[in-house]
């Protein structure tokens, strides 16, 4: 009797903030799991995205962007989460941006040089490079930095060459039993995903006005008799002025955030959602390691 082989492994997606790691993860999975925003540092937790195709199961770890500044407790914890992801995976996808190369990229590269896992270099946003003649010399420069498994120019936004990345990943998955059922796409709870959706809308609708010192706590997540969910979200900010910014003129801003978050939740949970949002000032939460632990920022370290 022949037993079908199965393949399964962990892949870390790493890179400095805002190079498109979350967009790449979402594209590899075929749907939105990790929040994306033009603001740097929007991924605060390691999110596991699971993609199963026949005998192959790829488990993606979406790290916070590794970055130089470690002054605040939240930044130290985010760097720790990103570094710990690199250590225990079969493969690393190192995402960089077009022809840009920064000290933060250099720092990530140095961490990868010390690691044992093979590294795919994904050069993202190549469709945005204005001077196409600059691209080839830059790719040659990158190739000289480390013995990469492969260098793939991609656009996570449009999907260009993302299938190439997926094919390389499949080829390097070790023979192993699958960790998750084939219909799983993330190991995160619905409660966690609800908070991520609200946080994405805050980033999207407040943009540059909003500091990083905002987080979301789901105080209530219960099934109701209508076959849907009642969800209460608490938005924590550090100052009174930030609270006014989130609420907006006559509550217009928080209403928009709530409407858009509810739409995404209904799509993700495939059920009606009744969502209520509040804003509360809790000064200094991003500097307070104990508060961060209570909000789940170190639950996976």
Curated annotation (Swiss-Prot):
Gene Ontology MF annotations: GTP binding; GTPase activity; ribosomal small subunit binding; small ribosomal subunit rRNA binding
Region annotation G2: where it falls in the sequence: 41-45
Region feature G4, mapped onto this chain: 124-127
Xref: InterPro entries: G_ERA_dom, GTP-bd, GTPase_Era-like, KH_dom-like_a/b, KH_dom_type_2, KH_sf_prok-type, P-loop_NTPase, Small_GTP-bd
CDD domains: Era, KH-II_Era
Chain intervals for the UniProt region annotation (G1): 15-22
ATP-binding listed as a keyword: no
Segments for region (G3): 62-65
Keywords: Cell inner membrane, Cell membrane, Cytoplasm, GTP-binding, Membrane, Nucleotide-binding, Ribosome biogenesis, RNA-binding, rRNA-binding
Protein residues bound to GTP: 15-22, 62-66, 124-127
KH type-2 domain sequence ranges: 206-283
A GO cellular-component term linked to this record: plasma membrane
Membrane topology according to the record: Peripheral membrane protein
Record localization: Cytoplasm; Cell inner membrane
Gene Ontology BP term (one): ribosomal small subunit assembly
Record domain Era-type G: where: 7-175
Domain of life: Bacteria
SUPFAM superfamilies associated with the record: P-loop containing nucleoside triphosphate hydrolases, Prokaryotic type KH domain (KH-domain type II)
Keyword Nucleus belongs to the record: no
Annotated region described as G5, given as residue ranges: 154-156
Major site of localization recorded for this protein: cytoplasm
Subunit structure: Monomer.
Function: An essential GTPase that binds both GDP and GTP, with rapid nucleotide exchange. Plays a role in 16S rRNA processing and 30S ribosomal subunit biogenesis and possibly also in cell cycle regulation and energy metabolism.
Record-stated family: Belongs to the TRAFAC class TrmE-Era-EngA-EngB-Septin-like GTPase superfamily. Era GTPase family.
Protein name (Swiss-Prot/TrEMBL): GTPase Era
Naturally occurring in which organism (per UniProt): Shigella dysenteriae serotype 1 (strain Sd197)
Record gene name: era
